Amino acid sequence: MEIKYVKGDATSPIIVEGKKSVIVHCVNTLGAWGKGFVVPLGQKYPQSRKIYNHFIQLHKKGYYTSLLGLICIAPNVSKDIDVVNLFGQERIYPIMKDGEIIIPLDYIALRKGFETIVDSYASEYSYKPVPITVHMPRIGCGLAGGDWNKVEKEKTYYTDERF
């Protein structure tokens, strides 16, 4: 899979004829949707927030022991555009513990989420290359304080192998 880095608005993916655009972003498990990339995303595609809230409610009712690493897809939020909410962090901001900064981003959860995204779309299409384009901000590297080099490594491992 060829990776192109484009500066711009990740809520407005570049549409490629014959391919579905998939916007992937990282969400927390708290039910807090109100800072960072989710603000413009939720304004443009309210279905993405609605399905996120649905998963939060299911978690609170005990349907999931943990949301970390899970994804929830808001399909067809616009013509040929899906939004994938990837549960990759438990908190919103880094904290200080015993003199060490602990970030809320969980790289293992990201890895699991990327793998699930790849499996979901690869199984939807029985041929390769899978006709999707993936669009995402530097997930987990804003408020959550993650390291883009580590996130990129996880993302590339799964996408390069499958698409």
Explain the meaning of each model-derived region.
Residues 1-163:
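Macrodomain-like recognition of ADP-ribose-binding/processing modules
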